[in-house]
Amino acid sequence: MDLKKFIRSIPDYPKKGILFRDITTLIKDEKAFEETINQIIEKSKKFNFNKIAAIESRGFVFASAVSFALKKPFIMLRKKNKLPADTHSVDFELEYGKATIEVHKDSIDQGESVLIIDDLIATGGTAEAAAKLINLSKGSVAGFIFVINLFDLKGCDKLIKLGYEVENLINFPGH
């Protein structure tokens, strides 16, 4: 199944000059969503990991389904002040400013290997921050799996240069 056909492209969203890749059309089709999860599971076989983490919020859609199917614990990497217990935090740069992601301090035990799943990678800033958060928690990053790679924005290349293994399902230009 060509999953690319299930991604809606919306020009000038959220601002002029951006071509938004919308996953809602993928996840509303049960066969396309199932195929997406199956492809992520297949790609995950190359990684050795104890837990699965995802970045708020669209990454949760895919990672929680994979976590359930593989019977692996699921960790939420959330925006600042969204988690109720003690957290580790990492600040990072966005295209429009700064952001912070957090994880509960008790989510990852020392030495655990974490697979990070997200819906999309663009410049790689959020993914790099997620990796820093896993490392700050005394875990290690097994690798990344993205549903969509905006290849000309070079986020996957950035992660690979940092020494991480990266897989993705669909390639699109960023603009």
Annotate each PLM feature.
Residues 1-175:
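PRPP-associated nucleotide enzymes
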